[in-house]
Regions:
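N-terminal signal-anchor/start-transfer transmembrane helix
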Residues: 21-31
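Core segments of transmembrane alpha-helices
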Residues: 133-143, 216
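Hydrophobic alpha-helical transmembrane segments
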Residues: 9-18, 150-159
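Alpha-helical transmembrane segments of integral membrane proteins
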Residues: 18-22, 164
Length: 234
């Protein structure tokens, strides 16, 4: 983002570096999950669809009331704790590939987290309304602080952005634990060692997207803090 000199805006070379690093991280993680998913979407599991295996995992985890519904798009799969439903993309819901089963079971893992009262998921759920507010307002508050030269508003903007960083950090153990639960179920489901290994690769690639997102947020926050500190000392 542009930064405030006091009388106008200029382009900070450090910001360009931050943008480059964050862009590379994001693209690398996204390309890796796309290629890994594509590879293992061509390998059949034991014949059951992602929805079927997810249903069995849900029932085994005591999540009998959790529904499974379809959602448009690719890799748009998610668990919604508000309506207690898994939303699986068509390819993963009706597909019987290793990738489909891995993704579907990962989402079932989130439902199992809620059922077992997993603490970090409770923390993330509690942060959702806060982050929804702060991530939509921090840039406005920051610009107001810069234009009006009010340090308090700039500090508030950084605090708001910090909630997004915190959310990304809390998300990491939640996603890793959901994948752990998925792998544990897949291992005892009768799939071959090759298929289990493929599922692990898909879920590892997916986890790296969250790692990249967390690193990106941390880098952005550190840049903003350094920029604010430098301007405050002028």
């Amino acid at each position: 983002m542009p930064y405030y000199y006091g009388y106008g805006f200029g382009i900070d070379p450090l910001y360009l570096l931050v943008v480059l690093v964050c862009t590379v991280l994001g693209l690398a993680a996204q390309n890796y999950i796309n290629s890994t998913y594509k590879t293992w979407s061509k390998v059949r599991s034991d014949g059951d669809t992602g929805a079927t295996v997810a249903r069995r995992m849900l029932d085994a985890s005591g999540c009998n009331v959790v529904g499974i519904k379809g959602v448009a798009g690719e890799l748009t799969d998610h668990y919604n704790p508000q309506d207690n439903n898994l939303y699986l993309s068509d390819a993963n819901r009706s597909g019987g590939s290793v990738a489909s089963v891995a993704v579907a079971c990962h989402e079932a893992g989130h439902a199992a987290q809620r059922q077992s009262g997993y603490a970090m998921m409770k923390v993330r759920t509690a942060l959702v309304p806060v982050v929804n507010f702060t991530q939509n307002t921090w840039t406005i508050v920051l610009l107001l602080g810069l234009f009006m030269n009010i340090a308090g508003l700039t500090t508030l903007a950084l605090i708001f952005f910090s909630f997004s960083v915190l959310f990304q950090l809390v998300t990491l153990p939640v996603e890793i634990d959901a994948s752990r639960r998925a792998v544990a179920y897949i291992e005892q489901s009768g799939m071959s060692s090759k298929q289990v290994n493929g599922a692990k690769k898909v879920l590892t690639a997916a986890a790296l997207t969250y790692v990249a997102a967390a690193l990106t947020s941390i880098i952005q926050l550190l840049y903003l803090m350094a920029r604010y500190s430098r301007n405050s000392n002028r």
